[in-house]
Amino acid sequence: RYWSAWPFGAVLLPSVALANTALVPSPPSINADSYLLVDFDTGAVLVEHNPDLQLPPASLTKLMTAYILAEEVALGRLALDDTVRVSRNAWSQNPVFKGSSLMWIEPGKPVTVAELERGIVISSGNDATVAIAEHIAGSEAAFVDLMNRYAEEMGLTRTHFENSHGLPHPDHLST
């Protein structure tokens, strides 16, 4: 008539022990020269591989261009309905842009800041980045200086821009 707890303990104790054990998966196999995964809530680095390796940012450069455009609008120095003059340098037929992503803008044809913003973000238009860079800073070179100042203020100490679009340049690098 005695009831033994032994069978229940044999089943229950391992289950409780497993429930309290955090299962941490091994890092995924990623075919990349560099990566970094950070927990959004805690800021803890979950997995990394060569996080300080400088690589060409390519079209990720356009994120900084679009960010500066948005900042200029937020500060009231630029309006989305402003008309931009497209230079021959920003023209889609510029040989620098051959074979690259374009918005297909032309000199002498009116284009608004909003259209250029869409051309940068949606079409990844290299011509659109130069047009907005020239409109904001007077020249692409002056805009690149602005990009590098923003990068420094953001703590992107190993990022250096050489153009507004991300086409290859040996010194156009980021981590």
Predicted regions and their residues:
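Bacterial N-terminal signal peptides
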Residues: 5-15
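Active-site-adjacent loops and short helices of periplasmic peptidoglycan-processing enzymes
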Residues: 19-175
